[in-house]
Regions:
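Hydrophobic alpha-helical connector segments
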Residues: 56, 70-100, 148-152
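Amphipathic alpha-helical packing segments from all-alpha helical-bundle domains
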Residues: 98-104, 114-139, 147, 173
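Helix-turn-helix
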Residues: 10, 14-52, 56
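N-terminal intrinsically disordered/low-complexity leader segments
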Residues: 1-6
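Short, basic, alpha-helical segments at the C-terminal edge of helix-turn-helix-like DNA-binding modules
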Residues: 59-66
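Amphipathic alpha-helical segments that line or abut small-molecule/effector binding pockets
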Residues: 13, 59, 81-96, 105, ...
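An amphipathic alpha-helix signature
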Residues: 12, 66, 85, 125-132, ...
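Hydrophobic alpha-helical segments that form the core
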Residues: 107, 142-165, 170-181
Length: 184
């Protein structure tokens, strides 16, 4: 009986985990193999080299933060406000690929790599388009739609970077109030 190979997705997932922890420079085949508890030989059954893995990591991230999330939200159904509520919920509880750590690592990487920057812009534009579609379904004012989209997306990108106290309220209460205001 042959040895069981480490699935391709596990290499990508571990690559994204390592990216979130240490940036693209930290994503090395030997490090990933050690984290997965395997030899690096299995890596080459899926990827030509490290650059091919990095490309697949980016493709996986882009697909999941755009069409993957949109498909989940649309599958849950409901009117635009309900779907936005599902989106807020999902972003708070999403998995590794859609995590804030991976998001921030890719944004940082994009500052130094034009190819990553193009992919990030494409993903951001797709996410903003989806928000416009949802907010536009119940906000008649185009400026209001754009403001809500920017606030919602800024919250996604930056909320975990803010370490300020929220006065007598805890962060969860404040985020719930923001959500209620955005959906009103």
């Amino acid at each position: 009986m042959g040895a069981i190979r480490t699935p391709r997705d596990r290499w990508i997932e571990e690559g994204l985990r390592t990216l979130a922890a240490g940036g693209p420079e930290a994503v090395r085949i030997e490090v990933l193999a050690q984290a997965l508890g395997v030899t690096k030989g299995g890596f080459y059954g899926y990827f030509r080299n490290r650059a091919a893995l990095l490309e697949e990591m980016l493709a996986t991230w882009e697909r999941e933060v755009t069409e993957g999330i949109i498909a989940r939200i649309e599958r849950d159904g409901g009117d635009a406000r309900e779907r936005l509520g599902h989106l807020f919920d999902f972003v708070e509880s999403g998995g590794l690929v859609t995590s804030a750590g991976v998001e921030m690592a890719i944004r940082d990487w994009a500052r130094r790599d034009e190819g990553v920057a193009r992919r990030l812009r494409r993903a951001d534009n797709r996410r903003m388009d989806y928000l416009r579609e949802l907010y536009g379904a119940f906000c008649p004012d185009e400026a209001d739609v754009e403001a809500r989209c920017l606030i919602t997306f800024s919250l996604r990108v930056g909320e975990h970077l803010i370490v300020a106290d929220n006065g007598p309220r805890d962060r969860a209460d404040v985020l719930a109030a923001v959500r209620d205001r955005m959906l009103s």
